[in-house]
Amino acid sequence: MQQKRIIVDCMGGDHAPGEMLAGAVAAKAALGGEYLLVGVRAEMESAARARSIDLSAFELRDAGSVIGMEDDPMCVLHAKKDSSMAVALRALRDGEGDAVVSTGNTGALFTGASLIVRRMQGIHRAAIATVLAFEKPTLLMDSGANVTVQPDFLPQFAVMGSAYMKGLFGIEMPRVGLLNNGTEACPCRRRRTACCPGCPVSGLSGMSSRMPCRLTCVMSRSRTALRAISA
């Protein structure tokens, strides 16, 4: 099996680039694979010397700037298109790796992933996915970035989440729940209807035309509700 190649934005997040370099070293030791480290080369090399990290097993790519947490998300496309995040995303788009890892500005990463890498055919809106630390593997889809979504986005989120759970955890038919931010009976019937079991998912090229799951509609903000979905 061909080794996966991970592209790492080494300038995002707290204590970068040192922490990202240390993480790449740990990941390579534990999981193998190849890693492309993107960042301001002088800063990466300085951080590596300070931590006695050997970078000889990694490919380094220089970037001209860094996107800060306070920056406008659109800067990844314009003002800071030479940033480590933008360079990493373009490398993924151009087929130089299998995934990008970044702990930087979430809005910029979401924007760049959608408009540089682009979405899969048939997916109209990207969604942030968060694995929750419950007894059973649980994935919370659309856990940030999207303020409002259209009803037809929800089945697409379900398909993407189901594919993730099958690929990562080997769950053939994940249980999908619709979690509402509120306690009213059903604030948006159209959204609930769009996610009904067996609802045709149109326009998803290469994917199943029907939902491979059972719907659970949970109306609560609580952790208990999330546990109900994962049960």
Regions found by a protein language model. Name each.
Residues A29-L31, R49-A57, F169, C196-V201:
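Short helix-capping segments at alpha-helix termini
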Residues F110-G144, C199-S208:
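Short, acidic/small-residue loops that bind anionic groups at enzyme active sites
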Residues H15-M20, D82-G95, A99-A113, M120, ...:
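Short glycine/serine/threonine-rich phosphate/pyrophosphate-binding segments
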Residues M1-E45:
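N-terminal phosphate-binding or glycine-rich loops at protein starts, especially the Walker A/P-loop
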Residues I6-G18, L77, A145-P155:
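Short, glycine-rich nucleotide/cofactor-binding loops
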Residues I53-G97:
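Phosphate/nucleotide-donor binding subsite
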Residues G18, E34-L36, A42, V147-G206, ...:
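Glycine-rich phosphate/diphosphate-binding loop of Rossmann-like nucleotide-binding domains
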Residues A91-F110, E184, R191-A231:
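Glycine-rich phosphate-binding loop
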